[in-house]
Amino acid sequence: VGSEMCIRDSLVINTHVCRGNYHSAYFSSGAYDPVAEKLFGEENVNAYYLEFDDERSGGFEPLKYVSGDKKVVLGLITTKSPVLEDKQTVINRIHEAAKYIPLDRLYLSPQCGFASCEIGNKLTEEEQWAKLALVKEIAEEVWK
C-alpha cells in the first residue's frame, strides 16, 4: 500500500484530444463546446493537450470549464503542414486563450506529433525542427 500511494501521489495524468494525424490528414473536426463542461470540468487529470491549429477546432471559450489548477497545452503549431505559423498570430491566440484560463496555466506545443503513425506527416526533418524552434521562440517571449 505504501508504494502504491507513493506512485499515485507522483503520477501525472494528461489527456490529448486527438483529431487524427495520419500522413498530414485529420479524421475528425469540431469545436470542444459539446464536450467541454464534462471533459474539462470532471475529468481527473493534471493537463490537457488540445489541438487548436486551425478553424476546425473552434474557439477558446470552452476553456472556461477547465476546473481547478489543471494546465492546458495549446496545440497552435500544426504538424500537418511545413508552412511556419506567423509568430504574432500565435502570440495573439495565446492571449485570447488567456481570457478563459490564466496565462500561467497555459503552455504552447505542436498540435500533435510529427509522426503519430509509421508513415508520419509530410514534413522534412528540417521543417519539423523549424516548427519546434518557433515554439521555443514564442514561449520565451510570452512566458518571460
What are these regions (language model features)?
Residues 1-7:
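Short, small-residue-biased leader/transition segments that mark boundaries at the very start
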Residues 7-12, 141-144:
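Secondary-structure boundary elements
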Residues 11-22:
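Aromatic-lined carbohydrate-recognition surfaces of secreted/lumenal glycan-active proteins
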Residues 20, 34-144:
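Catalytic-face loop-and-helix region of soluble metabolic enzyme cores
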Residues 27-31:
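Ligand-binding pockets and gating/stacking loops
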